[in-house]
């Protein structure tokens, strides 16, 4: 679980985009000397906390991290917020709970035991808000994409003007590392 959490928060350092599978296309990704690579690699707590901040301020408006709970914010190897900080973060979100004594659902402040709040009620609502695209959940993106963190880093660096003769619809951007070179998440 610790590695799962570490990887999830590393992703937030580099994401704020919509991507689809690139399995059919062979490209050379940008390489970076990651501090966490190798048998003696480790994550930088301050970087993970900044990563959470980036996720919260940028990515979470479209992307979920549905496999994490707010209690994961205090775990060793993750961003290691204090319990009080994590409780404050959780409480800043409204969570649907219930039913109450009258059989009705109600909203309450989040708790450490709650899963991260989703940006949309369901997949259809997410697609409707994003021009038909479903922003992927960020919890396991590094493991889900070929190339892992190098792919994600490359994708974030790969936005450029389309080559001559390539026309893009409104809300679609050219990215040399994206399968098909088209992405709906703006740079």
Positions of predicted regions on the chain:
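Extracytoplasmic/lumenal ectodomains and periplasmic regions of secretory and membrane proteins
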Residues: 149-187
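Post-cleavage N-terminal segment of exported redox proteins
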Residues: 2-9, 13-42
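C-type cytochrome heme c attachment motif
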Residues: 53-65, 117-123, 134-143, 151
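Structured domain cores in non-transmembrane regions
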Residues: 73-135
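A generic secondary-structure signal for well-formed alpha-helical elements
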Residues: 58-70, 159-163
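Stable alpha-helical elements in mature extracytoplasmic
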Residues: 44-47, 134, 148, 152
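A short, polar/charged loop/turn motif at coil->beta-strand junctions and beta-hairpin connectors
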Residues: 28-30, 110, 132, 177-181
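Electrostatic cytochrome c docking/interface patches
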Residues: 28-53, 64-83
């Amino acid at each position: 679980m610790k590695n799962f959490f570490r990887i999830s928060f590393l992703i937030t350092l580099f994401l704020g985009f919509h991507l689809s599978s690139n399995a059919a296309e062979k490209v050379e990704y940008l390489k970076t000397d990651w501090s966490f690579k190798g048998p003696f690699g480790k994550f930088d707590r301050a970087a993970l906390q900044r990563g959470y901040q980036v996720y919260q301020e940028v990515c979470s408006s479209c992307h979920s991290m549905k496999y994490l709970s707010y209690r994961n914010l205090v775990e060793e190897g993750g961003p290691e917020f204090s319990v009080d900080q994590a409780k404050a973060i959780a409480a800043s979100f409204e969570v649907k709970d219930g039913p109450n004594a009258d059989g009705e659902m109600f909203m309450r402040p989040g708790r450490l035991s709650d899963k991260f709040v989703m940006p949309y009620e369901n997949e259809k609502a997410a697609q409707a808000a994003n021009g038909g695209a479903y922003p992927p959940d960020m919890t396991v993106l590094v493991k889900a994409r070929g190339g892992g963190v190098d792919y994600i880093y490359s994708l974030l660096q790969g936005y450029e003007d389309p080559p001559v003769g390539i026309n893009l619809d409104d809300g679609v951007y050219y990215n040399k590392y994206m399968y098909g070179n088209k992405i709906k998440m703006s740079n």
